[in-house]
């Protein structure tokens, strides 16, 4: 019998994917650049529906999800659970214009539902890292098997007002920053110390919380990785290189824009690619890939966020 987890994954793919990820646009001979467009006539309602109904899948844990009543009206059950979780200790209510959960939920949808990967960190386990570290962690961490080998997907997301802001904030996540004297003032997330600490030192130790939803072969590959790190005293990046596993980096942004074709904003994509190519050298990583994914909206980010939280009162 299918688990509630599997039932919901299929439900979102059938009922929600087309709302915001209807058509993927590319640029010929460039595998890095992606844009999703959709039917803009119901944009606010579609963002609201996706956020409200996906919220339990993103926030709740696997053990709680198995008790959801999905036999009759799945939408009603998800809205009920969404409202309960919104007011629970799981969720800290903050200023909607600053709270990262909006973008984080949609990049999770992209990674798990559209791209069909599996999460490596639950919302609750990720918060444990946030509670004790100045660096708040990578926005989304997932994994899959690619030609039989482990691929770890590390994603950063911005849900902001403009394309320029999205580009600038994504580059800020990528690059180390220095003062006028050449002293390091902020480590970007594409930094070996940051990645070794967050993924190797924290995330891989949390796999008990998500292991029930991983395919056995995927779980075995993660065990190989942990063996290299724990028993053989390799860093995460050294272990990835030794096993020839891949990291896929996804930089995702949602912003208001009249441009609905990636060719019209190619320079913004290219600036992020240039930043990534400059910083990736520091990692010493042998096997990696890059996706830059944009969703342009008609409505402002603030209006979309206000619409999404209407049901919570």
What does each model-identified segment do?
Residues 2-84:
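A structured, charge-rich N-terminal accessory region that forms the first stable segment of a protein
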Residues 12-26, 262-313:
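Charge-rich, low-complexity intrinsically disordered segments
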Residues 84-108, 127-130:
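A short, highly charged nucleic-acid-interacting micro-segment common to nuclease
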Residues 111, 140-142, 151-159:
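Conserved catalytic cores of phosphodiester-cleaving nucleases, focusing on short active-site segments
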Residues 114-133:
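A short acidic/basic microdomain associated with nuclease active sites
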Residues 119, 145-151:
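Short, solvent-exposed loop/turn segments that connect beta-strands within catalytic domains
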Residues 161-172, 262-269:
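Active-site-adjacent loop/helix micro-motif of nuclease/hydrolase catalytic cores
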Residues 168-251:
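Acidic, metal/cofactor-coordinating or nucleic-acid-engaging core segments within structured domains
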């Amino acid at each position: 019998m299918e688990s509630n987890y599997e039932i919901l994954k299929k439900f979102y793919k059938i009922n929600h994917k087309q709302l915001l990820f209807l058509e993927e646009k590319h640029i010929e001979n460039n595998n890095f650049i992606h844009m999703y467009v959709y039917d803009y006539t119901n944009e606010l309602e579609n963002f609201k529906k996706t956020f409200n109904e996906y919220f339990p899948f993103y926030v709740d844990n696997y053990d709680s999800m198995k008790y959801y009543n999905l036999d009759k009206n799945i939408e009603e059950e998800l809205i009920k659970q969404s409202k309960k979780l919104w007011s629970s200790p799981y969720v800290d209510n903050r200023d909607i214009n600053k709270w990262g959960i909006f973008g984080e939920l949609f990049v999770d949808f992209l990674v798990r539902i559209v791209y069909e990967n599996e999460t490596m960190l639950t919302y609750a386990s990720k918060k444990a890292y946030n509670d004790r570290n100045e660096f708040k962690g990578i926005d989304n961490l997932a994994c899959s098997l690619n030609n039989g080998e482990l691929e770890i997907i590390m994603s950063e997301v911005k849900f902001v007002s403009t394309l320029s802001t999205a580009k600038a904030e994504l580059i800020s996540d990528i690059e180390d920053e220095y003062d006028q004297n050449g002293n390091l003032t902020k480590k970007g997330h594409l930094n070996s110390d940051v990645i070794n600490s967050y993924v190797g030192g924290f995330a891989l130790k949390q796999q008990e919380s998500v292991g029930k939803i991983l395919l056995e072969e995927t779980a075995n590959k993660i065990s190989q990785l942990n063996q290299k790190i724990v028993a053989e005293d390799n860093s995460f990046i050294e272990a990835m290189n030794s096993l020839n596993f891949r990291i896929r980096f996804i930089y995702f942004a949602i912003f208001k824009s009249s441009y609905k074709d990636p060719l019209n904003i190619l320079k913004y994509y290219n600036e992020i690619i240039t930043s990534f190519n400059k910083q990736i050298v520091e990692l010493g990583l042998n096997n990696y890939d890059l996706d830059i994914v944009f969703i342009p909206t008609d409505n402002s980010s603030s209006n979309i966020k206000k619409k999404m939280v209407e049901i919570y009162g």
